[in-house]
Each structure stands twice: as structure tokens, then as C-alpha cells.
Amino acid sequence: MTDGGAEKALVENGLVENGLVEKVDRGNGPDRGRIVVGVSGSLGSLAALHHAVAEARRTDVEVLAVLCWTPPGEELGYRRTPCPPVLTAGRDAAVARLRQALDEAFAGRYAGVRLRCQAVRGETGHSLVRCADRPGDLLVLGAGRDRGPLGRLVHPSVTAYCVRHAACPVVAVPRPPLQRELEALERGYGLRALVAGN
């Protein structure tokens, strides 16, 4: 099942590569808002997914979980040397990542929530803004990592992009404490604290 207007426009623009699941459609028309949530499989995106589902239960709207992906070598590399089997493999991997993220977040239980999922080909910020195009939509994102000035230059913030460009409200769900601790371990701070504590 798909809902007409917005999805059709996305398909015509080549953004939507695959619709995965749709649970209990109770008439979310194209003019009714949805909660669009960016999913990557990270702890932050899983926290955003939980926030989106809780808000959907409260407001009785549909959740659209979106995982954005690009072909290996990004779009420019793929345009230079197109290879349809590589594109298909990239899309299939994105679909598998999205299913895995949903399974990790909810163990297959979406109790009372209308949920649709899409793997969308394109740059993350731009694609999420395009998906959250209805009046009344709400875009929910995980706050992401604190990369520092150089990291932000190399990998600009998806959240900042969406806040600047989205036509709807954007909610940035704070990183869960476990994610902050894991990032500290990756940078070596946590290891030093563990050694100093013993």
C-alpha cells in the first residue's frame, strides 16, 4: 500500500528506491502530516526512531522511517562509471540496514503505529528534507556526533542542514548516554579514565 501524492512525486523524481513495509493504514491522506524520521542504524538514530514512534502514538499520525544511501563512490563516481548491479546491491544493502535498525529498535513490534519505511537514494540532508514535504510534517533526527570544527568541515551536520532547509519543524533527539560513552572510548578518553580509575 502506498499513499498517492507525496510518494508518487518522490518516485517520479527518482528519490524513492524501495518501499519496505506499511502497517495498518487508517487513512493518512496526502494533506495530513506525518512524522518523518531519519534512520542510519546508529544509537542516535534508534533514539530518534523511538521518539518518533512515541510522538506518533500520542498524535495518531503515520511514521515514515527513511534510510538515505548513495552508491559506492557517491553519485559523481557512479555517474562516471555506472554499473546497475552495483546500484542494485547498494539499494539491497540499504534495505537490509533499515530492516535491521527497525528490528533492533522494536523487535518487530510497532504497537498501534502506522509505519512505512523507505530506502531513499540521495544525500541524507537533502533527501530527508524532500521526504518531509507535507503540511504538518515533523522531521525527527538523532543529534549525531560532535565532530569538532575540522570534522564538521569534512562531514557537514545533517541536522544543521535540515534545520536550515526543512519547511517543517525539526526535532533533534539528543545522543543517548551510551553513544557519548562509546564515542569517548573511540577517541581514547574513556580508556584513559578507565586506566586512571584502577
Locate each region found by the language model.
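Active-site phosphate/pyrophosphate- and oxyanion-stabilizing loops and adjacent acidic/basic residues
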Residues: 103-104, 160
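Short secondary-structure boundary segments
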Residues: 67, 143-144, 174-175
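Structural beta-alpha unit
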Residues: 1-31, 44, 106-139, 177-184, ...
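Small/aliphatic-rich secondary-structure junction motif
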Residues: 8, 26-84, 165, 179, ...
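Short, flexible loop segments at boundaries between secondary-structure elements
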Residues: 163-180
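Glycine-rich, Arg-bearing micro-motifs that act as flexible, cationic patches
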Residues: 139-161, 180-182
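A short acidic, glycine-rich active-site loop
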Residues: 83-97
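General small-molecule cofactor/ligand-binding pocket signal
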Residues: 64-66, 116-120, 171-173
